[in-house]
Amino acid sequence: MSTSVAERLAIKDEVDKKIELRPNWSEDELQIVFKTAYEQVFGRQGLYASQRFATAEALLRNGKISVKQFIELLAKSEFYKECFFYNNSQVRFIELNYKHLLGRAPYDQSEIAFHVDLYAAAGYDAEIESYIYSPEYDNAFGNFVVPYYRGFQSIPGMKTVGFNRIFELYRGRANSDNAQFGGKSARLRSKISMNLANTIVPPTSPIAASTSSARTLVTSPVMGDARMFIVEAIAGTLNTNVAVRRSRQVYTVPYDRLSATYQEIHKRGGKIVKITPAS
């Protein structure tokens, strides 16, 4: 995804935001890991988190735990429960766990049902561990990368609805998960239950749900957005075991077809390389 498109989507600071605790780290680098972890796991509430986790910070600083285990301690903490568990519906809590711990939105009803059943059978800690000790987490973050929002770009195993769904959960860096329009209710329940993609809409708040009229890439098509975009993609090679050269394809797409084109390319096994405004 190009920088200009990421700016229009208000996600420039989140795309490719990979913070890793490397060997021979400095104290400044460790502090960046702490700050990023608090922001990812707690969102806006992360501003108040650091003094609550002095013991966990000491364990990571002294090499007793990995970044993955540090994230686990945060997500199993009473503070995380106070922020997201006690005051939200169960499905909303699952949505937020996907967002905070795997950096994406849940794709379909089977993922929601799995976690509902897991919590009922094994409890809170097992629910948190199911994300952090999953093959997906290991492949994406390993032991020393802080989770980040991956759903804005093509990722292995991603379903096409994931791109739209993450925008329903991520409403801007300054937005709080607990102060969004929709309150404690699940954001994805209706679309997931109907197996439909979510519509990408501008960020809103309970106070100012309709105050913004700025025309951006996420402006609703009904506002008459007539811009065109150039989508560059690498062709897919579905249903074949033969090694072939994958060609680069270029599409000129109107705004209101952008999401559909994204989905069509991924259904054919392709990968989007760049999206730029047409001059």
Swiss-Prot record:
Native source species: Mastigocladus laminosus (Fischerella sp.)
Domain of life: Bacteria
Family of the protein in this entry: Belongs to the phycobilisome linker protein family.
A GO BP entry: photosynthesis
Presence of the UniProt keyword tRNA-binding in the record: no
Function as written in the Swiss-Prot or TrEMBL entry: Rod linker protein, associated with phycoerythrocyanin. Linker polypeptides determine the state of aggregation and the location of the disk-shaped phycobiliprotein units within the phycobilisome and modulate their spectroscopic properties in order to mediate a directed and optimal energy transfer.
The protein's name: Phycobilisome 34.5 kDa linker polypeptide, phycoerythrocyanin-associated, rod
Principal cellular location given in the protein's record: membrane
PBS-linker domain residues: 2-178
Annotated localization: Cellular thylakoid membrane
UniProt KW keywords: Antenna complex, Membrane, Photosynthesis, Phycobilisome, Thylakoid
Gene3D superfamilies assigned: Phycobilisome linker domain (1.10.3130.20)
One Pfam family hit: CpcD
GO cellular component: a single term: phycobilisome
Membrane topology summary: Peripheral membrane protein
Transmembrane segments: none
Domain CpcD-like span(s) in chain numbering: 226-278
